[in-house]
Regions:
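Metal-dependent de-N-acetylase/amidase catalytic core
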Residues: 18-31, 118-282
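Active-site rim/loop-helix segments in enzyme catalytic domains that contact anionic ligands
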Residues: 18-131
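Bacterial N-terminal signal peptides
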Residues: 4-14
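Residues that line or immediately flank small-molecule/substrate-binding pockets and catalytic motifs
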Residues: 8, 65, 106, 140, ...
Length: 282
């Protein structure tokens, strides 16, 4: 008995935080994913496709235009922003999310941590209050420590966390309420992606949605093909025949497979935003 109690004390509290209703059974919820770039949602694509098919409303919000991510000297920032927006719209179509459910805040790629923080949080608060999500998907800011993410991912995770907290207090960014007719909103559930494997407590069976995740990933031609350094347009037929195979291998190699089933893993949290990043405290 003493050994059992000792074991229970050293297990991170987060492993017991799995959703009472399996994600595979969710229906009628509104989902908002906040990411840094126009492909950050890809690691959740199979889960998002499943949720959409199960009668949930799914929105994707991207903080930056992705207008820096290329090694092709022929492409300008403006051109790349347009290319990456269309890639994201096309990818979302593959998983059933319409263009009108895609929001891009227009910040420069690689510079999000230097953006006006109050303004950025205010924009996120606006969309949280407008959409009223039941569940937020975002990069994991960390559990009891800061998770290392590259700059835009790190900034997006903390901006999202702070915006969630601000959105529920009506006297913060009250112009949304007084002028825009929105209402304060508290998000009750969170699905964090991109964190450390040891912190993840929820595996979603996405076996039936693997091919849609692959099809969506193949739309990111400027990022995951030789278009990264020599962009020839969105059609993979314009690239070496090996590109499609390499892209597909990249996508499939990142899919978790156990006992013949495919999964996407998350750190699930239910509760106030103040406790999303730590266990019980005195």
């Amino acid at each position: 008995m003493k050994l059992l109690l000792t074991f229970l004390l050293i297990i991170p509290i987060s492993i017991f935080a799995q959703p009472a209703q399996p994600v595979e059974e969710w229906t009628g919820k509104t989902i908002l994913l906040i990411g840094g770039h126009p492909d950050d949602d890809h690691q959740s694509h199979a889960t998002l496709a499943m949720l959409k098919d199960h009668g949930n409303e799914v929105y994707i919000l991207t903080m930056t235009t992705g207008n820096v991510g290329t090694k092709d000297p022929k492409i300008s920032r403006f051109q790349l922003a347009q290319i990456r927006r269309q890639e994201e719209v096309d990818a979302l179509k593959e998983i059933g999310i319409p263009e009108e459910n895609y929001i891009n805040l227009g910040y420069d790629d690689g510079r999000l941590e230097f953006a006006d923080r109050e303004e950025a949080i205010g924009k996120l608060v606006y969309y949280i209050r407008k959409i009223h999500p039941d569940v937020l998907f975002s990069f994991d800011p960390g559990y009891n420590y800061v998770v290392w993410q590259k700059s835009d991912h790190r900034a997006a995770s903390y901006l999202a966390a702070d915006a969630v907290r601000a959105a529920e207090w009506r006297l913060l960014y009250e112009g949304h309420i007084i002028q825009d007719g929105l209402t304060a909103h508290a998000i009750p559930e969170f699905m964090f992606y991109g964190g450390n494997i040891s912190d993840k407590n929820t595996s979603v069976n996405t076996t039936d949605y693997v091919e849609r995740r692959v099809a969506a990933g193949l739309k990111y031609v400027s990022q995951w093909s030789s278009g990264w350094s020599d962009y020839k347009g969105p059609d993979l037929a314009a690239y070496p025949s090996s590109d499609r195979k390499a892209m597909e291998s990249r996508i499939r190699n990142r899919i978790i497979v156990e006992n013949g089933n495919s999964y996407e893993r998350f750190r699930y949290h239910k509760g106030p935003p103040d406790t999303m990043g730590h266990g019980p405290r005195d």
